[in-house]
């Protein structure tokens, strides 16, 4: 898959089929778009590409939305490649780009620089300054700029439209089973281990404190997890805690994981944490003894929850 970090692409990629969108999470709805676009591209003997944006527009406009993404950029690109994407146009979403009107986006970016023959978007696609552009506007200019627009109806689960926003809500309410079903894989985050206050060790559980950057924060509480350390293939079982340590007066939310059978220090190591099962909500305990007692029970429940099948 050829990657272009601007809309200026090689001549051989012009006249292709492209899908446009943010594609955060690359869920089943997005996958439907890719499958149909690839099918049309093959039928017409042209290449298939994706036009997307970095960072996500909502993260650019709302600086407080730092914890928002469902998937890392690296994962998105790997999934694009899996679905047979020939090239990727990854446009930097900045102040200048955000001011481009919908009509100028069609003329100056799509027509003059990418020059596609087929464009695939979901029927609720919005674009351009203040999101004034929609599928009707895109279709209106198709004849003038020599492209055909194909709208993809949203993929539905039990009558409800699948969306990245809906999956975020699933994670924030602890509904991991539904989130994973809509993603068609087990949701995970990547993060680096940083030094903490070593409270876990004092409570009898050596833990890794993970720095979470940009990812959506799931519901605070205890989780059954699986962990991959660095680039190794081996997967470890464990228990994860997302919260602020209310028993000790904490306020900042962070992720702490206890990897079963691992006692060595993992500072600065990258961990991939798969969220398998939500066990319970966060809770403030009267003292450390009561917390330890509950932690022992949590480990038992986590081991039961880890019997759930992992989907990569």
What do these predicted regions represent?
Residues 59-145:
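N-terminal Rossmann-like or analogous alpha/beta NTP/dinucleotide-binding catalytic cores
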Residues 195-312:
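Phosphate/ribose-recognition catalytic cores of enzymes acting on nucleotide-derived substrates
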Residues 9-13, 95-98, 155-160:
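A short acidic, often aromatic-flanked loop/helix-cap motif at beta-alpha or helix-coil junctions
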Residues 8-72:
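N-terminal catalytic cores of NTP/NDP-binding nucleotidyl/phosphoryl-transfer enzymes
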Residues 2-8, 89:
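Short acidic-hydrophobic, aromatic-tinged amphipathic segments that line or gate anion-handling sites
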Residues 142-241:
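Glycine-rich, Lys/Arg-enriched anion-binding loops that position phosphate/diphosphate groups
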Residues 27, 80, 119, 179, ...:
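Residue-level signal for inorganic ion chemistry
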């Amino acid at each position: 898959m050829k990657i272009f970090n601007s809309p200026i692409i090689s001549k051989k990629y012009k006249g292709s089929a492209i899908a446009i969108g943010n594609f955060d999470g690359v869920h089943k709805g997005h996958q439907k778009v890719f499958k149909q676009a690839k099918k049309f591209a093959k039928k017409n003997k042209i290449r298939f590409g994706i036009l997307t944006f970095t960072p996500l527009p909502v993260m650019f406009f709302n600086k407080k939305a730092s914890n928002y993404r469902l998937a890392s950029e690296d994962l998105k690109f790997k999934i694009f490649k899996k679905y047979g994407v020939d090239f990727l146009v990854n446009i930097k979403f900045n102040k200048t780009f955000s001011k481009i009107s919908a009509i100028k986006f069609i003329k100056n970016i799509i027509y003059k620089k990418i020059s596609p023959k087929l464009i695939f978007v979901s029927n609720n696609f919005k674009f351009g300054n203040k999101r004034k552009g929609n599928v009707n506007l895109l279709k209106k200019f198709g004849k003038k700029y020599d492209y055909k627009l194909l709208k993809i109806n949203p993929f539905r689960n039990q009558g409800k439209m699948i969306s990245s926003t809906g999956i975020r809500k699933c994670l924030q309410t602890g509904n991991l089973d539904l989130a994973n079903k809509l993603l068609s894989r087990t949701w995970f985050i990547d993060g680096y281990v940083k030094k903490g206050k070593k409270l876990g060790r004092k409570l009898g559980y050596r833990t890794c404190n993970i720095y979470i950057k940009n990812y959506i924060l799931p519901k605070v509480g205890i989780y059954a997890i699986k962990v991959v350390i660095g680039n190794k293939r081996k997967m470890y079982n464990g228990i994860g805690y997302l919260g602020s340590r209310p028993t000790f007066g904490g306020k900042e939310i962070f992720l702490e994981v206890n990897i079963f059978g691992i006692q060595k220090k993992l500072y600065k190591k990258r961990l991939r944490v798969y969220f398998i099962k939500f066990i319970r909500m966060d809770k403030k305990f009267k003292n450390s003894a009561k917390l330890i007692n509950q932690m022992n029970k949590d480990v038992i429940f986590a081991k039961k929850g880890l019997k759930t099948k992992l989907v990569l």
